[in-house]
């Protein structure tokens, strides 16, 4: 699971914070999963978030949430990882929950109720490696 803060890593000149940016976090977590034995052909993704929590008028360039969502989708596409489900945009934050033994991904908007977003399949085998 990744929680990105910004879409592009260009501000991270030293490359010290790859998990903070969509364009580096997605490849980094996929690389780590492969190192642990996962097969990229079996990976699937579900994403949630990308809300515009702060209003800045009509400037879409300041809509970091939308830019994050677009960057995550682009990174997944570039890596060939299918996007199974998404719940993005709007103006309300979300909480995401992953049940690792079933692959259930649930999302809850702030002040709302939890709902199933996707079932990605069994995530962990008994050895802890992606099944």
Model-derived regions: residue spans:
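Acidic, glycine-rich active-site loops and adjacent beta-strand->loop/helix elements
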Residues: 5-10, 49-53, 89-91
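Phosphate/ribose-phosphate-bearing ligand recognition and processing surfaces
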Residues: 52-65
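Surface-exposed interaction patches
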Residues: 43-44, 56, 81-82
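Conserved mixed alpha/beta catalytic, RNA-binding, or beta-rich assembly cores of soluble enzyme
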Residues: 1-36
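Conserved active-site and cofactor/substrate-binding residues in soluble primary-metabolism enzymes
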Residues: 20-24, 28, 38, 42, ...
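Generic secondary-structure signature for well-ordered alpha-helical cores
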Residues: 31-39, 52, 77-81, 101
């Amino acid at each position: 699971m990744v929680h990105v803060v910004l879409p592009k890593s260009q501000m991270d000149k030293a490359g010290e914070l790859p998990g903070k940016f969509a364009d580096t976090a997605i490849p980094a977590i996929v690389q780590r999963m492969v190192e642990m034995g996962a097969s990229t052909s079996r990976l699937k993704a579900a994403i949630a978030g990308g809300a515009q929590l702060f209003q800045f008028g009509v400037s879409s360039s300041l809509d970091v949430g939308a830019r994050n969502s677009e960057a995550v989708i682009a990174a997944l596409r570039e890596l060939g990882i299918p996007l199974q489900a998404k719940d993005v945009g709007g103006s309300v934050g979300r909480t995401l929950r992953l049940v690792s033994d079933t692959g259930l991904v649930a999302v809850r908007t702030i002040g709302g109720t939890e709902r199933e977003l996707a079932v990605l399949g069994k995530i962990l085998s008994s050895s802890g490696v992606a099944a």
